[in-house]
A protein has these predicted regions:
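Binuclear metal-ion centers of metallo-dependent hydrolases, dominated by the metallo-beta-lactamase
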Residues: 1, 83-139
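Active-site neighborhood of phospho(di)ester-bond hydrolases with catalytic His/Asp-centered motifs
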Residues: 31-34, 51, 70-76, 98-105, ...
Length: 139
């Protein structure tokens, strides 16, 4: 953890490569998952998928009860029908005011697909739909 009095950065172990970051700055709480996700690959060994789910849950449980003003979370269509698991698990542990999907490989409709799923009923209004590369928002 880095805390210089203005910026506080906490790192979390990834379930793939790199790390995830929780940044606190100027009264804002910003979470960037990087590759920390519930990776469930169809065709992968069932025990591997089970271990991945456990590892993801262990990391996000460290953030239990916190509120992120902005959360950047993987929503990867390569996972097929399981593309939404990471976001769905995350919002059960952490309140996120705005969710920015990432890792969607140019499939811009993936957020819209999640928003139509019954599991997202409690948070679909917080998912930001991204329509093109380079799009920007003011929060």
């Amino acid at each position: 953890m880095l805390d210089d009095g203005t910026l506080k950065v906490e790192g979390f172990k990834s379930t793939d490569e790199g790390v995830a970051f929780w940044c606190s700055v100027d009264g804002l709480e910003i979470y960037h998952a990087g590759d920390l996700n519930h990776w469930y690959w169809d065709g992968e060994d069932p025990q591997w998928n089970k271990n991945m789910a456990k590892a993801y849950q262990e990391e996000i449980s460290k953030m239990h009860g916190r509120t992120a003003d902005i959360a950047f979370l993987p929503l990867d269509p390569r996972l097929g029908e399981y593309f939404y698991l990471g976001i769905d698990d995350f919002v059960k542990e952490v309140d996120a005011k705005r969710i920015f999907p990432m890792h969607f490989w140019g499939e811009y409709d993936v957020a819209e697909r999640l928003k139509k799923m019954p599991c997202s009923a409690g948070y679909c209004d917080r998912i930001v739909e991204i329509h093109e590369e380079g799009e920007s928002w003011e929060i």
